[in-house]
């Protein structure tokens, strides 16, 4: 049956304020100069959905913003990229979730985060739109979705599976305690896509394959662990695939994991084979690292395919 949307992306939507390069914070009330400053829509849902939209698939955003000027920027930016924002809630008396990122010369990104609207987000019982009318349903931001984390997220993913969606998932801010809200989700996740660091923190294991097996044993169908400059590890009951990273000039790693998620989502929509899917997700992730912000680097689908087939693999 034809679906209205290629993908629904539900979860953490954040306004990012990024500056680079920041070698130090000025002492007292002093001033330092930087070369670049940007505002972007980011977060484990926001960064992913904008990249999906840039890659040409139809998108429905589901999340929450506050009732401030930051909310206006988030919604207008999503709509500029072609995201359907009918699934958004505007919450009275709450600030929009936002992050200040000071990007170091080596691409590291220490952050100051205002939790805000995402702490209060719950999809209303009566939706303005069918959020499950999609091919791929992505839940992004577990760990920073105070009201959504836990049984509500389990019910959302169960319903997505019941409705015939492919389910994909990612988180943010993992701790050992996060496993208590993540483990009940595992049987309802088709593609589990955290970073190796986050996955390791939650399960207490260190070897990538052991980590992936832990989550497969928990019920995940396909485990994809992103490993930064080392590429990614894919594991399911039939295949183990290590995909190397591309050789790129890193400017800022903000949103690279979100871009990997977007690449996998688009690859699933396009019905690519798993090896090509992983390679495509790797190039989308790598391209984002070449500029400032979670929406940098990616131009369109064809450009990503060209770069996937022409860029050198990191040695």
Regions found by a protein language model. Name each.
Residues 1-64, 69-80, 251:
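Glycine-rich phosphate/adenosyl-contacting loop at the front of the ribokinase-like
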Residues 1-7, 33, 159, 176, ...:
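Conserved phosphate-binding/catalytic region of the ribokinase-like
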Residues 2, 130-132, 186:
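A short, aliphatic-rich alpha-helical micro-motif
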Residues 49-58, 103-104, 267-271:
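Alpha-helix C-terminal capping segments
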Residues 59, 85, 167-168:
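Hydrophobic beta-strand scaffold residues
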Residues 77-94:
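A glycine-rich helix N-cap at a beta->alpha junction
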Residues 90, 101-146:
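Conserved phosphate-binding/catalytic loop of the ribokinase/pfkB sugar-kinase fold
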Residues 136-213, 231-232:
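Conserved beta-alpha-beta core of the PfkB/ribokinase-like small-molecule kinase fold
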